[in-house]
Protein backbone atom coordinates (compact mmCIF):
# COMPACT_ATOMS: atom_id res chain seq x y z
CA UNK A 1 0.00 0.00 0.00
CA UNK A 2 1.16 3.56 -0.59
CA UNK A 3 1.49 5.85 2.39
CA UNK A 4 1.05 9.61 2.72
CA UNK A 5 4.21 11.70 2.44
CA UNK A 6 5.54 13.74 5.29
CA UNK A 7 3.76 11.93 8.10
CA UNK A 8 4.60 12.10 11.81
CA UNK A 9 6.68 9.21 13.11
CA UNK A 10 8.81 7.86 15.93
CA UNK A 11 11.65 5.36 15.66
CA UNK A 12 10.90 2.15 17.54
CA UNK A 13 14.06 0.26 16.62
CA UNK A 14 17.00 0.58 14.25
CA UNK A 15 19.75 -1.79 13.19
CA UNK A 16 22.56 -1.80 10.65
CA UNK A 17 21.52 -2.95 7.19
CA UNK A 18 24.03 -3.43 4.40
CA UNK A 19 26.72 -0.82 3.88
CA UNK A 20 25.97 2.63 5.37
CA UNK A 21 22.24 1.86 5.72
CA UNK A 22 19.89 1.04 8.57
CA UNK A 23 16.69 -0.98 8.81
CA UNK A 24 14.28 1.07 10.90
CA UNK A 25 10.92 0.27 12.46
CA UNK A 26 8.77 3.42 12.70
CA UNK A 27 5.54 4.09 14.55
CA UNK A 28 3.22 6.32 12.52
CA UNK A 29 -0.53 7.04 12.56
CA UNK A 30 -0.64 4.61 9.61
CA UNK A 31 0.78 1.85 11.79
CA UNK A 32 4.19 0.28 12.17
CA UNK A 33 6.28 0.77 9.04
CA UNK A 34 9.66 -0.76 8.25
CA UNK A 35 11.97 1.20 5.98
CA UNK A 36 15.55 1.34 4.77
CA UNK A 37 17.40 4.51 5.73
CA UNK A 38 20.27 5.28 3.37
CA UNK A 39 23.37 7.12 4.57
CA UNK A 40 22.55 6.11 8.13
CA UNK A 41 25.89 7.45 9.38
CA UNK A 42 25.06 10.99 8.26
CA UNK A 43 22.65 13.65 9.54
CA UNK A 44 19.60 11.47 8.96
CA UNK A 45 21.13 8.70 11.04
CA UNK A 46 21.56 11.05 13.99
CA UNK A 47 17.79 11.64 13.93
CA UNK A 48 16.92 7.96 13.65
CA UNK A 49 16.80 7.27 17.35
CA UNK A 50 13.95 6.55 19.73
CA UNK A 51 11.76 9.22 21.32
CA UNK A 52 12.49 11.92 18.72
CA UNK A 53 9.34 13.29 17.02
CA UNK A 54 9.93 13.12 13.27
CA UNK A 55 8.35 13.93 9.97
CA UNK A 56 9.15 11.17 7.49
CA UNK A 57 8.42 10.71 3.82
CA UNK A 58 8.15 7.02 2.96
CA UNK A 59 8.61 5.78 -0.59
CA UNK A 60 7.64 2.46 -2.10
CA UNK A 61 4.54 0.29 -2.18
CA UNK A 62 5.97 -2.90 -0.74
CA UNK A 63 6.15 -3.84 2.92
CA UNK A 64 9.79 -2.72 3.08
CA UNK A 65 9.88 0.97 2.23
CA UNK A 66 12.59 3.56 1.76
CA UNK A 67 12.99 6.77 3.73
CA UNK A 68 12.85 9.59 1.20
CA UNK A 69 13.03 12.48 3.64
CA UNK A 70 13.30 12.67 7.42
CA UNK A 71 13.26 15.79 9.56
CA UNK A 72 12.89 16.61 13.23
CA UNK A 73 9.34 17.59 14.14
CA UNK A 74 9.98 18.77 17.69
CA UNK A 75 12.18 18.43 20.73
CA UNK A 76 13.41 14.95 21.61
CA UNK A 77 11.87 13.45 24.73
CA UNK A 78 14.69 13.18 27.27
CA UNK A 79 14.40 10.33 29.75
CA UNK A 80 16.76 8.58 32.14
CA UNK A 81 16.65 5.64 34.53
CA UNK A 82 13.37 3.78 34.86
CA UNK A 83 11.56 6.31 32.67
CA UNK A 84 13.98 5.42 29.85
CA UNK A 85 13.49 1.71 30.49
CA UNK A 86 9.73 2.29 30.36
CA UNK A 87 10.02 4.00 26.98
CA UNK A 88 12.06 1.07 25.67
CA UNK A 89 9.38 -1.27 27.01
CA UNK A 90 6.68 0.61 25.09
CA UNK A 91 8.75 0.37 21.92
CA UNK A 92 9.24 -3.37 22.30
CA UNK A 93 5.54 -3.90 22.96
CA UNK A 94 4.64 -2.04 19.78
CA UNK A 95 7.15 -3.97 17.67
CA UNK A 96 5.86 -7.28 19.01
CA UNK A 97 2.12 -6.57 18.96
CA UNK A 98 1.37 -3.99 16.29
CA UNK A 99 0.86 -5.52 12.83
CA UNK A 100 2.79 -3.91 10.00
CA UNK A 101 0.92 -1.25 8.02
CA UNK A 102 -2.21 -1.53 10.16
CA UNK A 103 -3.37 2.05 10.91
CA UNK A 104 -3.91 2.86 14.60
CA UNK A 105 -3.83 6.67 14.96
CA UNK A 106 -5.10 6.47 18.55
CA UNK A 107 -2.12 4.28 19.50
CA UNK A 108 0.26 6.84 17.97
CA UNK A 109 -1.35 9.71 19.90
CA UNK A 110 -1.34 7.82 23.19
CA UNK A 111 2.29 6.80 22.66
CA UNK A 112 3.37 10.41 22.14
CA UNK A 113 1.41 11.52 25.22
CA UNK A 114 2.90 8.72 27.32
CA UNK A 115 6.46 9.65 26.32
CA UNK A 116 5.82 13.23 27.39
CA UNK A 117 4.37 12.10 30.72
CA UNK A 118 7.38 9.84 31.33
CA UNK A 119 9.75 12.72 30.60
CA UNK A 120 7.85 14.91 33.06
CA UNK A 121 8.42 12.37 35.82
CA UNK A 122 4.83 11.18 36.23
CA UNK A 123 4.39 7.92 38.22
CA UNK A 124 5.46 5.05 35.97
CA UNK A 125 3.08 2.26 36.90
CA UNK A 126 -0.23 4.03 36.08
CA UNK A 127 1.24 5.23 32.76
CA UNK A 128 2.39 1.75 31.76
CA UNK A 129 -0.84 0.04 32.76
CA UNK A 130 -2.88 2.63 30.85
CA UNK A 131 -0.74 2.19 27.73
CA UNK A 132 -0.92 -1.61 27.88
CA UNK A 133 -4.68 -1.57 28.29
CA UNK A 134 -5.32 0.96 25.53
CA UNK A 135 -3.03 -0.93 23.16
CA UNK A 136 -4.83 -4.22 23.80
CA UNK A 137 -8.20 -2.53 23.40
CA UNK A 138 -7.26 -0.74 20.18
CA UNK A 139 -5.96 -3.99 18.69
CA UNK A 140 -9.25 -5.71 19.48
CA UNK A 141 -8.00 -7.73 22.45
CA UNK A 142 -9.78 -5.75 25.16
CA UNK A 143 -12.46 -7.03 27.54
CA UNK A 144 -14.96 -5.55 29.96
CA UNK A 145 -13.46 -4.44 33.26
CA UNK A 146 -16.75 -3.83 35.05
CA UNK A 147 -18.68 -6.97 34.04
CA UNK A 148 -17.94 -10.69 33.82
CA UNK A 149 -18.12 -12.92 30.73
CA UNK A 150 -21.85 -13.41 31.35
CA UNK A 151 -22.52 -9.68 31.39
CA UNK A 152 -23.08 -9.56 35.14
CA UNK A 153 -21.68 -6.51 36.98
CA UNK A 154 -18.57 -7.30 38.99
CA UNK A 155 -19.17 -7.82 42.69
CA UNK A 156 -16.87 -5.87 44.99
CA UNK A 157 -16.37 -8.94 47.18
CA UNK A 158 -16.20 -11.38 44.26
CA UNK A 159 -13.16 -13.25 42.97
CA UNK A 160 -12.38 -13.45 39.26
CA UNK A 161 -9.94 -15.00 36.82
CA UNK A 162 -9.08 -13.86 33.33
CA UNK A 163 -10.17 -16.01 30.42
CA UNK A 164 -7.99 -14.55 27.68
CA UNK A 165 -9.97 -13.33 24.66
CA UNK A 166 -13.20 -13.85 26.61
CA UNK A 167 -13.08 -11.75 29.75
CA UNK A 168 -13.39 -12.06 33.50
CA UNK A 169 -14.99 -15.17 34.96
CA UNK A 170 -16.27 -15.27 38.52
CA UNK A 171 -14.99 -18.19 40.59
CA UNK A 172 -15.98 -19.41 44.02
CA UNK A 173 -12.98 -21.55 44.98
CA UNK A 174 -9.66 -20.01 45.93
CA UNK A 175 -6.88 -20.63 43.41
CA UNK A 176 -3.66 -18.88 42.35
CA UNK A 177 -3.82 -15.77 40.19
CA UNK A 178 -7.29 -14.52 41.09
CA UNK A 179 -8.39 -10.88 41.13
CA UNK A 180 -10.66 -9.20 43.65
CA UNK A 181 -13.74 -7.45 42.34
CA UNK A 182 -12.80 -4.29 44.24
CA UNK A 183 -9.41 -4.21 42.50
CA UNK A 184 -10.92 -4.73 39.05
CA UNK A 185 -13.54 -2.03 39.56
CA UNK A 186 -10.80 0.35 40.67
CA UNK A 187 -8.86 -0.48 37.48
CA UNK A 188 -11.91 0.27 35.35
CA UNK A 189 -12.01 3.76 36.87
CA UNK A 190 -8.20 4.16 36.93
CA UNK A 191 -8.55 4.73 40.68
CA UNK A 192 -5.09 3.78 41.91
CA UNK A 193 -5.81 4.87 45.48
CA UNK A 194 -7.51 1.51 46.15
CA UNK A 195 -5.03 -0.76 47.98
CA UNK A 196 -3.67 -3.48 45.71
CA UNK A 197 -5.16 -2.04 42.51
CA UNK A 198 -1.84 -1.18 40.84
CA UNK A 199 -0.16 -4.49 41.60
CA UNK A 200 -3.28 -6.36 40.48
CA UNK A 201 -3.34 -4.32 37.26
CA UNK A 202 0.25 -5.34 36.56
CA UNK A 203 -0.63 -9.02 37.00
CA UNK A 204 -3.75 -8.67 34.86
CA UNK A 205 -1.95 -6.94 32.00
CA UNK A 206 0.84 -9.54 32.05
CA UNK A 207 -1.73 -12.31 31.75
CA UNK A 208 -3.59 -10.49 28.98
CA UNK A 209 -0.41 -9.72 27.03
CA UNK A 210 1.26 -13.12 27.42
CA UNK A 211 -0.85 -14.98 24.87
CA UNK A 212 -0.25 -12.30 22.23
CA UNK A 213 3.50 -12.27 22.85
CA UNK A 214 3.75 -15.91 21.84
CA UNK A 215 5.60 -17.07 24.93
CA UNK A 216 8.72 -15.04 24.13
CA UNK A 217 9.81 -12.81 27.03
CA UNK A 218 10.21 -9.08 26.60
CA UNK A 219 13.89 -8.14 26.75
CA UNK A 220 13.12 -4.66 28.10
CA UNK A 221 11.52 -6.11 31.24
CA UNK A 222 14.94 -7.38 32.30
CA UNK A 223 16.21 -3.80 32.52
CA UNK A 224 13.98 -3.18 35.54
CA UNK A 225 15.56 -6.14 37.35
CA UNK A 226 19.16 -5.01 36.96
CA UNK A 227 20.75 -3.26 39.99
Swiss-Prot record:
What's an example GO BP annotation here?
double-strand break repair
Cross-referenced InterPro entries: ARFGAP/RecO, DNA_rep/recomb_RecO_N, NA-bd_OB-fold, RecO, RecO_C
Q: Which Pfam families match?
A: RecO_C, RecO_N
Q: Which GO terms describe its cellular component?
A: bacterial nucleoid
SUPFAM superfamilies, alphabetically?
Answer: ArfGap/RecO-like zinc finger, Nucleic acid-binding proteins
- Keyword annotations of the record: DNA damage, DNA recombination, DNA repair
| Gene3D superfamilies to which the protein is assigned, alphabetical | Nucleic acid-binding proteins (2.40.50.140), Recombination protein O, C-terminal domain (1.20.1440.120)
Q: Note whether DNA damage occurs among the keywords.
A: yes
Question: HAMAP family in the record, alphabetically?
Answer: RecO
Q: What does this protein do?
A: Involved in DNA repair and RecF pathway recombination.
Q: Which PANTHER family match?
A: DNA REPAIR PROTEIN RECO (PTHR33991:SF1)
Give the family per the record.
Belongs to the RecO family.
Supply the name of the protein: DNA repair protein RecO
What organism does this protein naturally occur in? Answer: Pseudomonas syringae pv. syringae (strain B728a)
The taxonomic lineage of its organism, from the top, reads:
Bacteria, Pseudomonadati, Pseudomonadota, Gammaproteobacteria, Pseudomonadales
